């Protein structure tokens, strides 16, 4: 059973002067910091459960980022430093005839003012294989209701550099001190008022894979202001494996406003050389909505799948169920 302990960060200096000693006052905090602390305290009083947990996660992330940012200069973190895309999620999934799988994921990106807002710190705990190869979130094992590989779930951290809106570089470590690097190019082409194509190419390096690449492309059509159809495909190959691993999703996404989303997806995935056209095929229904304010979201997934890992195994069938909570910070 996984337990979460809130991490409190207490900072302050207490100076006690002797008789005749000079007393040096600490620098006054910036007005923006005072307002932020006051607002956070008010939120914590109004919500004594979820808001303190969210503040603890965010404060811990900022504390780590301040330390890294101080390596590059004396500019205060409050002068442009901020957490973006912070997420902490707990997800439980199970497939028929398999043991349930509980996973905890954490991801955050923090902009560093001492690097002129061109670089950011990224850190988290996730499927390191998907992180290194830059798999689209919608095609992750979790979102396809596939059991996690515990050996691939690990902490990671590093620095990212945004050279251009379309070009980013990352260098970091995962699973202890295993280095990796990747470069991502992305571009979007509007094909009219209702259609759009998104392309993403990522080149990555690890000591085990050597050079590899992940290509992802999606086509979206806005059927109406609340209904979108999307076809998403991704494929990964490395110098070590020399075989494509691919996945695809064709789905309809109906928005009901206020972050309420209903989706129906047809999913398939495969591996070159497996002897079968697709190693996993399935249909999946998903509902997502806020459960507390606009930053704590819940989701429920139900799917039916037909896996076949290789040509020697008959295609079987299995129901799958997943439920999760995601906190944005």
State what each model feature region is.
Residues 34-165, 170, 318-319:
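Transmembrane beta-barrel domains of Gram-negative outer membranes and organellar outer membranes
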Residues 77, 93-99, 144-148, 170-176, ...:
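Outer-membrane beta-barrel domain signature
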Residues 86-94, 121, 155-175, 194-205, ...:
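Transmembrane beta-strand segments that form the barrel wall of outer-membrane beta-barrel proteins
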Residues 100-104, 151-155, 177-181, 209-213, ...:
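Residues that define the transmembrane beta-barrel architecture of outer-membrane proteins
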Residues 107-109, 156-160, 184-186, 216-218, ...:
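Outer-membrane beta-barrel architecture
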Residues 113-115, 162-166, 190-194, 222-226, ...:
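Outer-membrane beta-barrel channels and translocator barrels
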Residues 238-296:
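Intrinsically disordered, low-complexity segments enriched in Gly and acidic/Ser/Thr residues
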Residues 301, 315-329:
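Outer-membrane beta-barrel "beta-signal"
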């Amino acid at each position: 059973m996984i337990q979460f302990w809130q991490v409190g960060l207490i900072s302050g200096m207490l100076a006690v002067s002797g008789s005749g000693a000079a007393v040096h006052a600490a620098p006054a905090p910036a007005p923006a910091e005072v307002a932020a602390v006051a607002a956070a305290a008010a939120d914590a009083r109004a919500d004594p459960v979820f808001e303190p947990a969210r503040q603890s996660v965010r404060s811990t992330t900022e504390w780590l980022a301040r330390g890294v940012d101080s390596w590059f200069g004396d500019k205060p973190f409050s002068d442009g430093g901020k957490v973006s895309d912070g997420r902490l999620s707990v997800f439980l999934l199970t497939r028929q005839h398999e043991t349930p799988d509980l996973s905890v994921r954490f991801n955050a990106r923090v902009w560093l003012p001492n690097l002129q807002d061109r670089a950011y710190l990224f850190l988290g705990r996730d499927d390191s294989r998907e992180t290194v190869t830059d798999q689209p979130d919608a095609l992750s094992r979790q979102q396809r209701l596939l059991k996690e590989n515990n050996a691939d779930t690990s902490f990671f951290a590093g620095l990212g550099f945004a050279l251009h809106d379309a070009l980013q570089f990352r260098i970091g470590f995962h699973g202890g001190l295993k280095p990796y690097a990747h470069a991502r190019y992305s571009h979007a082409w509007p094909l009219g008022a209702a259609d759009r194509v998104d392309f993403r190419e990522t080149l990555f390096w690890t000591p085990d894979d050597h050079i590899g690449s992940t290509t992802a492309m999606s086509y979206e059509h806005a059927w109406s202001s609340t209904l979108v159809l999307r076809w998403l495909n991704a494929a990964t190959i490395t110098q070590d494996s020399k075989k494509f691993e691919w996945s695809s999703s064709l789905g309809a996404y109906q928005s009901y406003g206020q972050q309420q989303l209903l989706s129906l997806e047809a999913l398939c995935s495969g591996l070159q050389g497996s002897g079968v056209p697709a190693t996993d095929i399935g249909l999946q229904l998903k509902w997502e909505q806020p459960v507390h304010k606009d930053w704590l979201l819940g989701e429920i997934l139900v799917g039916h799948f037909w896996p076949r890992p290789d040509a020697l195994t008959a295609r079987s069938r299995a129901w799958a169920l997943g439920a999760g909570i995601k906190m944005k910070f």
